[in-house]
């Protein structure tokens, strides 16, 4: 029996990052140098101690030659690397919010974020992967599309099927 809600996609980011880094043959230090960040950032993210910004995840994905959407949220495949549009996050957020007829206050209530956070993102501030996923869930859109401008705007619903019960042969 399935209970509760599935974990957010960004929960798998630490494992995806570590496995992809190791498969590429990079140490934490080597990846940090390729991505232009500190090796502590790689360690914190792989350890699940911090959630990174969309930009940092995009730099890791570029350095590893994989998809930023896959690395951040587990959507698509690792090989689907493409140009990301982080700068368009605010515009995508504002347009979907307006299309859904939601005020900033409605979105604040639905996400638990502050109004300053929502306003900041709509005005171009960078956001963390966990924040974008919370907003995407509240708006009913794909976090990959909202954060990076990649993939379908709305994900197809996940359907879990039960296997038929085994029957005894006569």
Regions found by a protein language model. Give the residues of each.
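A short, Lys/Arg-rich alpha-helix, primarily the initiator
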Residues: 1-23, 77-99
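Helix-turn-helix DNA-binding elements, focusing on the entry/boundary residues of the two helices
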Residues: 17, 28, 39, 54-57, ...
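Conserved hydrophobic/aromatic packing and binding residues within compact polymer-binding modules
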Residues: 17, 28-32, 42-45, 71, ...
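The alpha-helix within a helix-turn-helix
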Residues: 21, 32, 61, 97, ...
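Recognition helix of helix-turn-helix/homeodomain-like DNA-binding domains
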Residues: 36-52, 75, 112-127
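Short, basic-rich loop-to-helix N-cap that marks the start of a DNA-contacting helix
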Residues: 48-62, 124-137, 153
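Short C-terminal boundary/hinge segments that cap the last helix of small helical domains
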Residues: 65-80, 140-156
């Amino acid at each position: 029996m399935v209970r509760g809600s599935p974990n957010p996609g960004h929960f798998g980011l630490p494992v995806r990052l570590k496995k992809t880094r190791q498969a590429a043959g990079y140490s934490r230090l080597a990846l940090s140098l390729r991505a232009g960040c500190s090796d502590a950032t790689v360690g914190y993210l792989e350890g699940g101690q911090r959630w990174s910004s969309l930009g940092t995840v995009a730099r890791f994905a570029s350095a590893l030659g994989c998809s930023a959407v896959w690395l951040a949220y587990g959507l698509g495949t690792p090989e689907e690397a493409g140009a990301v549009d982080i700068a368009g996050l605010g515009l995508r957020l504002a347009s979907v919010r307006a299309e859904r007829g939601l005020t900033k206050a409605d979105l604040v209530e639905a996400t638990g974020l502050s109004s300053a956070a929502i306003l900041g993102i709509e005005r171009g501030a960078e956001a963390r992967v966990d924040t974008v996923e919370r907003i995407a869930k509240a708006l009913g859109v794909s976090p990959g599309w909202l954060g990076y401008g990649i993939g379908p705007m709305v994900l197809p619903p996940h359907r879990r099927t039960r296997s038929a019960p085994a029957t005894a042969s006569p």
